[in-house]
Structures are given as structure tokens and as C-alpha cells.
Amino acid sequence: MAKIALILGSVRSPRVGNDVTGWVHDVLKSRPSDDLQIEPLVIADFNLPVYDEPVMPAMVPAMKQFTKEHSKRWSAAIASYQGYIFVIPEYNGGIAGGTKNAVDYLYNEWPGKPVAIISYGTQGGNRANAQLSESLELVMKMKVAPTKVLLPFAAGTDVFSAINDGVLGEESQKAWAEAGKKEDILKALDEVKELLKQPKE
């Protein structure tokens, strides 16, 4: 059985990412029975500082080793999965620093594995989605699912509750369902499944 990490990219507190990732997880649970095991993975739980290792990630493990416990834990966690689904916010028109820092902590744990990207924000996080897609595909040599899911918050009180209170509003959830976002998420997962069948390059 292949294990897929459902990675929550935000490290802020409060963060609406908890609710968004929960909503996405519920959608994924609605899929027909398959041989995938999907597990939530929260970047904030690893307490990663700005990269503080004395070695380049690309040198690990062939030539060097990580020296910090947080790096070792993060590396071991990511290495244990065969694929990933990122759920990421967009801050100030781009990828969140905590997300990028966590990705850049590692190198050899990523290449050849499939990944889907789901983003959220006032406009759905399209810029952050595109930036992470490019980084993972071109630099980390990952297989990025073609379907990029954008989850924009409903206008009005939902935006304020998301930003200020870390709460996902009912109107946003309703709008996502009506816009076919659940189907998009399941389509992205199907693409990850197909990419899993391809040999690593």
C-alpha cells in the first residue's frame, strides 16, 4: 500500500489551513476504495527554523549527514512517503516562507515522486500554486499532477474569519462544492495514482 502525505504548508497561528486541510481530507476520504493510505502531515509540528544545517541538503546522505534533530525528523518523515499532496496558503502574492523553507530543507527525499498541489487564499492562491509547482518540478525533479486546485475564499465575512480567526466559513465550503472543487481534488489524486505507476527517472 502506497502512503501519501497530505501536507499542511502553513506554520502560522491561528491558521485556516487546519480547516482547509480537514475539508480536503474529507473529500479524499469519499473516494472509492483503493490501495492508498493518506496521512495528514503538518509542517508546523516539526518546528523547523530557517535552514540551520552546516551541510547542503543535496549532499545528504551520500556525502554528509544532517546534524540537527528537527532536520532528521523531517527528513525521515518525508522519506517514508511515496507521494504527496500539498495544501498551501498564498501570502503577499507568493508561496509562504514556512512552506518554502520546509521544502528546501531536503533534496534527495523528493525526486521522482508524484505530488499534487492545492492552494487557498483570497484569489485561490494561484501564484503560490504556480511557484511551488515550478520549484518541485524543475528543481526537485518531482512529478507534478497537471490538475492544480485553487480554493478562493468567499467574499465578505469568510475572508475575515479565515485571516483573523483561522476559521473556514460555510460560504467558502459551499462555493467550492458548487464550483466542482471536490471533483478537481479527486482528479488530482487520480493523477497522483497514475504517476505512482511510472518508474522513477
From Swiss-Prot:
Known pathway: Secondary metabolite biosynthesis; terpenoid biosynthesis
Enzyme class per UniProt: oxidoreductase
GO cellular component labels: cytosol
Keywords: Flavoprotein, FMN, NAD, NADP, Oxidoreductase
SUPFAM superfamilies, sorted: Flavoproteins
Superkingdom, taxonomy of origin: Eukaryota
An individual GO BP term: terpenoid biosynthetic process
Catalytic activity, EC: 1.5.1.39
Pfam families: FMN_red
InterPro entries (UniProt xref): Flavoprotein-like_sf (IPR029039), FMN_Rdtase-like_dom (IPR005025), NAD(P)H-dep_reductase (IPR050712)
Subunit text: Homodimer.
Protein name stated in the entry: NAD(P)H-dependent FMN reductase ntnL
Source organism of the structure: Nectria sp
